[in-house]
Amino acid sequence: MSQARFIAFSDGSALVNPGGPGGTGFVVLDRARPAYRFGGTRWVEDGPNAVTNNRMELRAVLEALEGLPGGEQVEVISDSRYVVDALSRWIHGWRKKGWRTASGEPVLNRDLIEALDARASALSVRYTWVRGHDGHAVNEVVDQLAQAAARGVAGPGEAEVVAALRAEAFLAGGPAAPRSSRA
């Protein structure tokens, strides 16, 4: 785990892949304060940008990065190898090749990848992959937030987010809970 000021956990879900509906979930921890925010969004899209798991994963990262102050270090933690590889490895070659893959095909989800690249350019972002459904408490919470958003139902609340952050030692236990906001 890096010493970044912000730790952003994200996950996406598509109930039907492709076609949706889909949902996003995120938790962002500001370790300098300490404070956190969390949320999720339901998405229904069709046409060339129809809901897919990968689009929801990318949207979740974009939502997590929104509003972070420029110049700050951020570690994005995702259980999506696609997100981590696309944003930390493949993007450099895609830009050089005019947004074409190694096989010459157009890059899928280019709109979201370019939006994330623009947002990340104002920050110092490191992408870290974790195995999903493998005991990472905060990753489980963002998964639940994404699935609940996709279904249009209430997801985990503040108590569950705090418990997950404490379980992974991102927050100290005790009576004084950090400030939060639900996006």
Swiss-Prot record:
Belongs to the RNase H family. It comes from Anaeromyxobacter sp. (strain K). This is Ribonuclease H. It holds the Pfam family RNase_H. Keywords: Cytoplasm, Endonuclease, Hydrolase, Magnesium, Metal-binding, Nuclease. GO terms for biological process: DNA replication, removal of RNA primer. Mg(2+) 2 binds at D11, D143. It is found in: Cytoplasm. GO terms for molecular function: magnesium ion binding; nucleic acid binding; RNA-DNA hybrid ribonuclease activity. SUPFAM superfamilies: Ribonuclease H-like. GO terms for cellular component: cytoplasm.
